């Protein structure tokens, strides 16, 4: 494997074929994936919601076991995970961080009981 990790980057999901070293640097890995969720802190993550996303990530990785570790397969996992995050937001389990640096509502305007 090369020294440059493969990566998938969506708006709220980053997946790397790498591990994070003690110094915070990424080290390429042919058998480990690192998940970076919501790097811009657009959402408020409660522990149960975070656990659901991590579980879904594990399911997607398990489903892809035995396939080539390629850009395409990483993008499929990342895109599916991004869709899952959208579902959580639409179901009201995840909410926007109103204290975020920028409020761009990238997954649609916030939903309130009055607008449902």
Swiss-Prot record:
Indicate where this protein resides in the cell: Cellular thylakoid membrane
Looking up InterPro entries in the UniProt record yields: NdhM (IPR018922)
Record's catalysed reaction(s): a plastoquinone + NADH + (n+1) H(+)(in) = a plastoquinol + NAD(+) + n H(+)(out); a plastoquinone + NADPH + (n+1) H(+)(in) = a plastoquinol + NADP(+) + n H(+)(out)
- Which superkingdom does the taxonomy of this entry point to? Bacteria
Q: Which GO terms describe its cellular component?
A: plasma membrane-derived thylakoid membrane
Q: Which gene specifies this protein's sequence?
A: ndhM
Keyword terms, alphabetized: Membrane, NAD, NADP, Plastoquinone, Quinone, Thylakoid, Translocase, Transport
The Gene Ontology terms for molecular function here are: oxidoreductase activity, acting on NAD(P)H, quinone or similar compound as acceptor; quinone binding
Give the family from UniProt: Belongs to the complex I NdhM subunit family.
Q: What does this protein do?
A: NDH-1 shuttles electrons from an unknown electron donor, via FMN and iron-sulfur (Fe-S) centers, to quinones in the respiratory and/or the photosynthetic chain. The immediate electron acceptor for the enzyme in this species is believed to be plastoquinone. Couples the redox reaction to proton translocation, and thus conserves the redox energy in a proton gradient. Cyanobacterial NDH-1 also plays a role in inorganic carbon-concentration.
The membrane topology noted for this protein in its Swiss-Prot or TrEMBL record is:
Peripheral membrane protein
Entry EC no(s): 7.1.1.-
A Pfam family of the record is NdhM
Q: Does the keyword Transcription regulation apply?
A: no
UniProt name for this protein: NAD(P)H-quinone oxidoreductase subunit M
What broad class describes the main subcellular location of this protein?
membrane
Instruction: Quote the subunit structure annotation.
Output: NDH-1 can be composed of about 15 different subunits; different subcomplexes with different compositions have been identified which probably have different functions.
